[in-house]
């Protein structure tokens, strides 16, 4: 086991605290929608028309004042809602205090989750809710944390700007220009503060021992991952759909990979 200097440990601890803020203090309630309900014996076609008008995909079903399940709009035809309602599956139910990041992984497996307040189902979350600001803030926070860790690790592994050997002259010049500009504004920085995420990517991927310690199997896989991460960050920064160029499955995989890489960074 390698020795981690106290200053490095303190930084890792502060990053963990920041990560905890994103992952534990923002809950599923921040993106959930209050779920309207219909009665078990109401006419299914009438309820479907109402759901179309209100743009509901699902609607809770009540019987004797208790929400016992839900109906899916596209499944409703002739008859009563009793013929079409689905009982809640245990895998579809989560507590209102569930961390938001866990919600992402639940929705990897199912189309919707329902929120329990006490012993009553009151709210719903679907894939469409993953475009909301709290999710965007969470994802941007995870990417920012990863960049902070990479900055820390690069400074530790490459003292006195020896990371320059892994960048081309154009990228170094761009960093130096930004460094000069920021120094002229009396910012207390070093050259590595001016590296972009693509620079950090190239430095890490070109240093094989470091790449392997971070659990990145090959340089090509690492390049693919970081390019997808940059696309996501750009979409977040410019208020584009999170999965503009990716399916949700690809997005969930990217988040899982980021979580894994963050875990490796925290051990260094």
Language-model segments: which ranges?
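Tandem CBS (Cystathionine beta-synthase) repeat/Bateman regulatory domains
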Residues: 1-268
């Amino acid at each position: 086991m390698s020795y981690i200097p106290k200053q490095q440990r303190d930084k890792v601890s502060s990053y963990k605290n920041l990560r905890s803020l994103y992952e534990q203090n923002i809950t599923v309630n921040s993106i959930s929608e209050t779920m309207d309900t219909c009665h078990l014996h109401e006419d299914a076609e009438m309820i479907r028309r109402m759901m179309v008008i209100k743009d509901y995909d699902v609607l809770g079903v009540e019987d004797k004042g208790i929400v016992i399940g839900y109906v899916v709009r596209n499944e409703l035809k002739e008859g009563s809602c009793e013929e079409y309602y689905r009982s809640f599956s245990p895998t579809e139910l989560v507590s209102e205090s569930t961390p938001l990041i866990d919600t992402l992984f639940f929705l990897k497996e199912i189309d919707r989750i329902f929120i329990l307040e006490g012993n009553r189902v009151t709210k719903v979350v679907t894939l469409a809710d993953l475009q909301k600001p709290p999710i965007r803030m969470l994802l941007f926070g995870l990417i920012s944390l990863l960049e902070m860790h990479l900055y820390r690790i690069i400074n530790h592994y490459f003292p006195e700007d020896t990371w320059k050997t892994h960048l081309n002259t154009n990228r170094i010049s761009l960093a130096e220009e930004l460094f000069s500009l920021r120094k002229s504004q009396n910012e207390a920085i070093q050259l590595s503060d001016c590296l972009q995420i693509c620079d950090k990517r190239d430095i890490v991927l070109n240093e094989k021992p470091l790449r392997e310690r971070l659990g990145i199997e090959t340089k090509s896989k690492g390049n693919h991952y970081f390019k997808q991460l940059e696309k996501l960050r750009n979409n977040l920064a410019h208020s584009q759909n999170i999965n503009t160029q990716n399916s949700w499955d690809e997005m969930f995989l990217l988040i899982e990979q980021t979580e894994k890489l963050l875990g490796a960074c925290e051990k260094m």
